[in-house]
């Protein structure tokens, strides 16, 4: 399975912070935002990853992340000239996906919870159909919304409905089989002129090939697209790290745990990791 991180957009809700900086490189407590979706893919066992961003911001991601070899993964890059909807990621990334199943994750989404790795790896094992994740929210009109029957089987999906049929939001994490490229290529723009990922999910639902996994109590899904939500995410991560003395979304640690790099390679990274708390943490692990 291959992964795509969509890290485009202009981040207008975070102006002036994002006037010259990509939203996905802003810090969420002690590390760049993009480390969180990156490590989510790594926890799913995904090692081939495409990062999609704007022409202006692309050099920043390349300087920050490189080719991924330091973490035992392969990173490639592609440009999204203008933000025309989430499903556009599969038009831009068609050659990269090249007939493989894939996972798309939004670059400003953070996931955390006991058992998350198991859910991710289960979804990553799919060969047919699609798996998306639903999360209970207080403001469903801001999201794609999934309607369930009494048995928690998906009945419908709507994008930012004025009158939501449920309080279950579709999160920014999607697992698809190889058919997604053709589905995305044949979409028509929505009323707001975008290629909607909700339309992709709806097609899988109509074909009887959509699984919706519920992230219930004990899971956190954080969207960091506004100043308040960015601060809340940073406070959440800080609390976890201070209370339990571990790092959240540390790619070096995840790479070691997943067997992507050896103990010796990890130790070399830790030696070069600087004098701050992050480097000290890596050296303690080494």
UniProtKB/Swiss-Prot annotation:
GO biological process: biosynthetic process
Record GO terms (molecular function): glucose-1-phosphate thymidylyltransferase activity; metal ion binding
Record's keyword annotation contains Transferase: yes
Chain positions recorded as Mg(2+) binding sites: 108, 223
InterPro entries named in the record: G1P_thy_trans_s (IPR005907), NTP_transferase_dom (IPR005835), Nucleotide-diphossugar_trans (IPR029044)
Membership in a protein family: Belongs to the glucose-1-phosphate thymidylyltransferase family.
Protein name as catalogued: Probable glucose-1-phosphate thymidylyltransferase
UniProt source species: Sinorhizobium fredii (strain NBRC 101917 / NGR234)
Lineage: Bacteria, Pseudomonadati, Pseudomonadota, Alphaproteobacteria, Hyphomicrobiales
